[in-house]
């Protein structure tokens, strides 16, 4: 029997898009706020600085043989004291991404 044996291994951590960085009346869509699963303090966020993010979504038309597309980003800094991070994406995240999942990859490593 050919194929993969054993359990599947996930090489990323799940995160949730909370929204754009904002003030009381303005929002700044070039910076997005992400809550990473299992990260609850500002000290834990420091390990994720510089790590790559991917927002994967499904489109109606095919491009390069796939309906799935991806917007890449990078964790830039912490936001507050409860494990939320600020991140910048290559193009601003669409409004439908609020509450959606992102993948937080374990590279580039700074160990």
From Swiss-Prot:
A Pfam family matched in the record: Ribosomal_L35Ae
UniProt key word Acetylation: no
GO molecular function: mRNA binding; structural constituent of ribosome
GO cellular component, one term: cytosolic large ribosomal subunit
Keywords: Ribonucleoprotein, Ribosomal protein
Protein origin, superkingdom: Eukaryota
GO annotation, biological process: translation
Family: Belongs to the eukaryotic ribosomal protein eL33 family.
Protein name listed in UniProt: Large ribosomal subunit protein eL33z
Species assigned in the record: Arabidopsis thaliana
């Amino acid at each position: 029997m050919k194929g993969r044996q054993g359990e599947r291994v996930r090489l990323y951590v799940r995160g949730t898009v909370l929204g754009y960085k904002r003030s009381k009346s303005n929002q700044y869509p070039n910076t997005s706020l992400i809550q990473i699963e299992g990260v609850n303090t500002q000290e834990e966020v420091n390990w994720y600085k510089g790590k790559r993010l991917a927002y994967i979504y499904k489109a109606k038309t095919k491009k390069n043989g796939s309906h799935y597309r991806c917007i890449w980003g990078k964790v830039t800094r912490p936001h507050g004291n409860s494990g939320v991070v600020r991140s910048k994406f290559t193009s601003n995240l669409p409004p439908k991404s609020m509450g959606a999942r992102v993948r937080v990859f374990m590279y580039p490593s700074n160990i």
